[in-house]
Every structure is written in C-alpha cells, then in structure tokens.
C-alpha cells in the first residue's frame, strides 16, 4: 500500500534553501590520504553531456564483460596555478589561519579577483611557514590555486576562480617542501587524479528563481472538491493554531536552485589532453568547442554548462577499487538537432 501521509518530497536537511554565497563551492572535509604529498582535488568547467560505449567491468553485473552505453559529463580542466600556501593551526575553537606565502609571479587577470600582493617577500614568507611547522603550530597546509578561464573559448569570462585545496600525504615537513616546489607553478589533473578513480563532484546547481510548492517540494496538486476553492497548486493549510506562527517545516514557495550540492562516488572514465576527440560536430550546446584537457565523469554533474565544478577524491569510497575502464566508442554526433 502506498504511503498516505506525504507532506513533502524534498529534504529539510538543506533548509533554508537560499542562494549560494558564491559560485565557487567550498569543501569542509577531505579524505584521508597516505601517499606522497599531493594536492587533493582539482577544478574545471562543465561542458555538457554525451555517451560512451564501454565494457561493463562491474563484478556480478548481468552485463559484465559486455558493451554497455553509459552517459558521461565532459568537464574541461585546463591547468591550474598555485598562487600561495596557507598554514592552519587548530585549537579548542577550531581551525584558524596562521600564516601564508604568496608568489609574485601571477597572471594579470588575477588582479580582477583579489588585490594581489606587490611587495611580498616569498622566501621570507615560506621560512615563516616552515618555522611554524617546526614549532608544531601547524595542523594542515592548503594550496591557494586558481583556474584560468581566459584560456577557454567556451567560458566567456576572464576572472579566475580562487580556491583552497588541501595538501596531504607524508609528514608536514614533506608537505611544506612539496608546497614550496609547486608555488607559482601549474598543476594538472593528471597529477592529482587517475582514470578509474572514484571522486566527489561539487557545484552550484542551476538557478530557477522563485518557484511554487508543487515544483519546489513535490506536494500534490489539489484534486476533486479541494480544487473548487479556486487554487490548485498550493498546500492544504499552513499548520495548527498553536504554536501561533507558521513553522519553517511548512512547504512554501521560495528560491529553488543555485545551491551548492555534492554528488558522491562518481567514476572518472577518461582523462584526455585533446578536446577535439570528444567534441561533437558543431560543438556542445551552450558551450562550444573543447580545445584543451578534459575529463569524462560517469553520470551527471550538478549545475548548467560553463559552471565551475570542483573535484576531490571520494571521501566515502567504500570497497570501490580503481580499474581502468575499456572505452570502445565516444559519441561525437551533432547535438544541433
């Protein structure tokens, strides 16, 4: 028997459903990592979707070993540049920034985003970070990296997106040595993630503005005699007399979309350097041509085309093992209709 009581279909865990503060997503936690020092994550711009024909390598699957069609999302991932290194300490009140070191060799477009340091002594700042590590004050190190959308033809903007990405692996001394090595240099997705790995993708979803309770919460349209009151796409009532106010759990109209969402355990099917091999005839709708490095992610990714997408190693990977998928075909059929 179906469930009779169905006040809403949406989760209250995301309330209040308001617009994201920034189109650049933020991570509050990172997965454990025990390998060599590396930057945990990367960022790119969503291009669109296509499909591939690959061999099903999922054990115990009814189609194991057979060719299956899989939808994929294309994310263009040009090299990012490390602008600085930030050291965090931790006390009873939580994490807080201690000190940081910036490079002076920055792209001119970054000045559109922040006030870039002009008379910054990079060597002295790095020594201050190393001293804080030696004194045991530092708990974590983060790389301050920014994207380079000015190198993309499909993203019509010049302003880079700046973000923090944790440096993990080895001891703190190894991490600060690695941070000093990559400071001011480019990093690529191939150095951080590998084909077949499971990742988490985070982006700000497509904004839909103000929507009613039927679309926003999935409540039913009024039926039969209930619709004779003149309104159909509304809720039955706003709640009891007492408490003498409208509770926040009541499904009402309001902002829908443009909220940060994370989807877990997405598999990387391919990392490529030449976007021409996956660009359909006429280009991707609402994006255009992919000319540089790209990544194919199984399934969908939040947000519209051209939206910034952050990628990190899966934090809830479970028993998934890294297996290189066998892709036999990538659809480049025109999407123009």
Swiss-Prot record:
Protein name: Large ribosomal subunit protein uL3
Spans annotated as Disordered: 1-28
GO molecular function, one term: structural constituent of ribosome
InterPro entries: L3_arc_euk (IPR045077), Ribosomal_L3_dom_3_arc_sf (IPR044892), Ribosomal_uL3 (IPR000597), Ribosomal_uL3_arc (IPR019928), Ribosomal_uL3_CS (IPR019926), Transl_B-barrel_sf (IPR009000)
One Pfam short name: Ribosomal_L3
Lineage of the species this protein comes from: Archaea, Methanobacteriati, Methanobacteriota, Stenosarchaea group, Methanomicrobia
Organism per entry: Methanoculleus marisnigri (strain ATCC 35101 / DSM 1498 / JR1)
Claim: Ribonucleoprotein is one of the keywords in the record: yes
PANTHER family per UniProt: 60S RIBOSOMAL PROTEIN L3-RELATED (PTHR11363), LARGE RIBOSOMAL SUBUNIT PROTEIN UL3 (PTHR11363:SF5)
SUPFAM superfamilies: Translation proteins
Keywords, in A-Z order: Ribonucleoprotein, Ribosomal protein, RNA-binding, rRNA-binding
Subunit structure: Part of the 50S ribosomal subunit. Forms a cluster with proteins L14 and L24e.
Coiled coil: none
Single GO BP term: translation
Role: One of the primary rRNA binding proteins, it binds directly near the 3'-end of the 23S rRNA, where it nucleates assembly of the 50S subunit.
GO-annotated cellular components: cytosolic large ribosomal subunit
Family note: Belongs to the universal ribosomal protein uL3 family.
């Amino acid at each position: 028997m179906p469930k009779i009581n169905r006040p809403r279909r949406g989760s209250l865990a995301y309330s209040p459903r308001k617009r994201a503060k920034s189109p650049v997503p933020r991570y509050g936690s990172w997965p454990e990592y025990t390998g060599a020092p590396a930057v945990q994550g990367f960022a790119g711009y969503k291009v669109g979707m296509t499909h591939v024909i690959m061999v099903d390598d999922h054990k115990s699957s009814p189609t194991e070993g057979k060719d299956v069609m899989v939808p994929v999302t294309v994310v263009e991932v040009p090299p990012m540049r490390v602008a600085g290194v930030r050291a965090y300490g931790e006390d009873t009140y939580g994490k807080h920034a201690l000190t940081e070191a910036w490079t002076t060799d920055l792209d001119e477009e970054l000045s559109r985003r922040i006030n870039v340091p002009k008379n910054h002594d990079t060597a002295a700042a790095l020594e201050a970070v190393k001293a804080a590590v030696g004194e045991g004050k530092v708990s974590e190190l983060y790389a301050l990296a920014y994207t380079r959308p000015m190198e993309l033809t499909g993203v019509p903007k010049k302003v880079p997106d700046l973000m923090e990405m944790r440096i993990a692996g080895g001891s703190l001394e190894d991490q600060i040595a690695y941070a000093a090595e990559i400071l001011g240099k480019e990093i690529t997705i191939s150095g951080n993630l590998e084909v077949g790995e499971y990742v988490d993708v985070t982006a700000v979803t497509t904004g839909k503005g103000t929507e009613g309770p039927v679309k926003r919460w999935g409540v039913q349209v009024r039926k039969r005699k209930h619709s004779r009151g003149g309104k159909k796409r509304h809720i039955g009532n706003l709640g009891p007399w007492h408490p003498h106010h409208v509770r926040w759990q009541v499904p009402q109209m309001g902002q829908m979309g443009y909220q940060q969402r994370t989807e877990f355990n997405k598999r990387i099917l391919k990392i490529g350097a030449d976007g021409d091999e996956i660009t359909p005839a006429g280009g991707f709708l609402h994006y255009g041509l992919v000319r540089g490095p790209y990544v194919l992610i199984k399934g969908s990714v939040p947000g519209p085309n051209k939206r910034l997408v952050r990628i990190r190693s899966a934090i809830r990977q479970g028993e998934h093992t890294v297996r290189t998928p066998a892709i036999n075909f990538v659809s480049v059929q025109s999407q123009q209709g």
